[in-house]
Amino acid sequence: MALRKCACIDTLYTELDWLDRFQAAKNDGFEAVEFWDWRIRDLDATREAAEKAGIAISGFNGDADYSLVDPTHKQKYLDYLKQSIAAAKKVGAASVTIHSNALGDGGIVVDHYDNLSHTVKLCSMYDTLLACAELAEKEEINLNLEALNITTDHVGNFLATTQMGAEIVRLIGCPRLKLLYDVYHMQINEGCICDTISNYGDTFGHIHVADAPGRHEPGTGEINYKKVIRH
């Protein structure tokens, strides 16, 4: 897969006003930007700033308050995803990021669903993702399903391994549904980064990088990014 450099402007350039971050990312050689919550942004101004800077908007989070693992959330999840897709089209973004569980402030998992069995959570996630994939095909938008670490940042998140995410993506078989592979999260959860890329890289639609521990720039932690990138 062809890769382009993308900056998350919710974590980078925070010393600048929101609309100035697009040009800053462009000046630093990034080809695209992404961010988290589209609801708190002026979408018209956001698109204008990106176009003025000559930088693409890759995407943003698309699921907010709803969870794939909660069978009672299915319709609400889909309804909100439709709004997110409309927002993505408004700013010219090609994708939205989705998760197994709703995330609150600071990425805290809103509900661990300890009352639901593993089987119920898995079946609910698969069932709702099937409907999400159909919607993505219809709307011609890409969905990137992200697994998160469950020891440091997102305790209680259901989707925590690349294998589970990749197998679901392969079973559904929709080219619009891919994995968002986060090197930082998966180093914490499972390690074996290069083997994971070899085994499941065909399911990746987007990749996040940060070093572990600490979630800082590559080269500040234990991950051998030179080898990962060559791989």
Where do the model's predicted regions map?
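Aromatic- and acid-rich polysaccharide-binding/catalytic face
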Residues: P175-M186, F204-H208
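A short, conserved beta-to-alpha structural element at the edge of catalytic cores
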Residues: T203-E217
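Distinct, well-ordered alpha-helical segments
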Residues: W18-L19, D44-E51, E137, H154-I172, ...
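N-terminal pre-domain/capping segments
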Residues: M1-A94, T119-V120, R170, C174-K178, ...
